[in-house]
Structure formats: C-alpha cells, structure tokens
C-alpha cells in the first residue's frame, strides 16, 4: 500500500509541474486569453491564499469532485460503454441466489474503459467553466481516471487530487525556472518522472502469480 501511495504522490506532483508549465507556455502565446484569465482569477478570488481558501482548494474541492466525477460519473460512464460489467472497484465474484453458482465478474473491454475515462475527463474539465482551467483539468482528469482503473480504489484518486491541487501552491518554490530552456528541461524531467511513477504504480497493482498458476515443466 505504501508503494502505491508513494507513486500516487509522485504522480500528482509531477503532473502539476507538467500541466502548470505547459499551460503557462500556451498562455504566453495567447496574450489576450492570458489577460482575460488573469481578470477572471482576480474577480472570482481564485488566487486567494488565505487558510480557508487553501484548505478548500487542497482538501474540500478534491474530495467532493472525486466523489462526483470518479465515483459517480465514471461508474455510470463505464456501465454505459460496458453494460456487462460491475464497478471496477468491486472486482469480486457473486453468487446467484437461485442455484448458488458463482458467476465470474464480467470484465469491461479496453475501448469501453478508454471511452469512460475520456468522457469523465471531459465532464471534469467542463465543470471548471472556463477554457483555461477546463483544458488542464481535462488533461489531469485523464490521469485521474487511469489511476482509478489501475488501482480500482477511489481513495487513491482522492489522494492524487489532494496532491495535485497542493502542488499548485508549491510551484512558487521553483523560482529558478525562468527561461524557456529551463521550462523545457523541467517539463521533460517531470514528464519522465510522471511516466515512471505511473509504470511503477501499474506494476504494484498487478497481482503476483500464485504457485498453482505456474506451469509445471518437470
């Protein structure tokens, strides 16, 4: 469990670095959009750094959004594209009352899972009600959905969302990233760390083969 938690934390921080700097780079090419977004942030108080605002952003919003998007919207999306399967975090066999036989859990197909991940990410982005936040929230939502599918546990996506939002406040510590070259190198390193952390998380979620499952070559 601790290995998974560590991977999720690293994924959240690395994802924030990648998404944050890529968003800033895109806005630097669109000065009018950047000005409109800055005005929106000022008018809505999204840049508020008071204790209450930070707690709401880091703890309250991720918890509620994960319950809604990954907990409800993703489940119904998954069932819509894969009507034969049950929720991913209920991977178990169930008995039929009429004869007591065990019915295996029907696995969703790959395209159905991918479609559900994309749909919930799109809805997650739309919920932010502006195109700047919508784009990076949608991109982050793809990773959140992947983590849910990989771990099968909603608690890991809640933790991931906590870390991702907290990372936005830690970006100010990277004062040494100034030039375009610095940004490119930082994004490349963070991207590599992100991919490696996702790979390790995937490996940690693959069950080890049982002794009875191993072929007998003797």
Residue ranges and their predicted role:
Residues 1-64, 74-105, 109, 216:
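Juxtamembrane helix-loop-helix connectors linking adjacent transmembrane helices
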Residues 2-6, 10, 14, 111-118, ...:
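Alpha-helical hydrophobic membrane-insertion segments
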Residues 15-27, 77, 123, 127, ...:
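Alpha-helical membrane-inserting segments
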Residues 28, 162-218:
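C-terminal membrane module of polytopic membrane proteins
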Residues 49-53, 104-120, 153-156, 178-182:
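Membrane-interface starts of transmembrane alpha-helices
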Residues 63, 67-68, 72-73, 130, ...:
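Active-site His/Glu-centered metal-binding helix of metallohydrolases
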Residues 70-81, 170-175:
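Membrane-interfacial alpha-helical segments at the cytosolic side of multi-pass membrane proteins
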Residues 121, 126, 133-189:
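Functionally important transmembrane alpha-helices
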């Amino acid at each position: 469990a601790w290995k998974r938690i560590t991977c999720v934390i690293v994924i959240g921080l690395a994802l924030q670095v990648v998404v944050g700097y890529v968003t800033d780079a895109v806005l630097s090419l669109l000065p009018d959009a950047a000005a409109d977004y800055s005005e929106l942030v000022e008018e809505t108080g999204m840049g508020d750094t008071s204790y209450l605002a930070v707690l709401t952003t880091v703890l309250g919003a991720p918890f509620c959004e994960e319950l809604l998007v990954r907990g409800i919207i993703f489940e119904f999306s998954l069932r819509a594209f894969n009507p034969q399967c049950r929720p991913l975090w209920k991977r178990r066999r169930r008995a039929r009352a009429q004869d007591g036989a065990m019915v295996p859990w029907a696995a969703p197909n790959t395209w159905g899972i991918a479609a559900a991940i994309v749909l919930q990410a799109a809805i997650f982005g739309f919920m932010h009600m502006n195109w700047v936040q919508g784009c990076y929230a949608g991109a982050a939502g793809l990773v959140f959905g992947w983590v849910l599918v990989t771990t099968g546990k909603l608690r890991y996506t809640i933790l991931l969302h906590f870390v991702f939002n907290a990372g936005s406040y830690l970006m100010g510590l990277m004062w040494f990233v100034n030039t375009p070259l610095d940004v490119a190198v930082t994004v490349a390193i963070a991207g590599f760390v992100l991919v490696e952390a996702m790979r390790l998380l995937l490996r940690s979620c693959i069950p080890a083969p049982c002794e009875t499952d191993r072929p007998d070559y003797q």
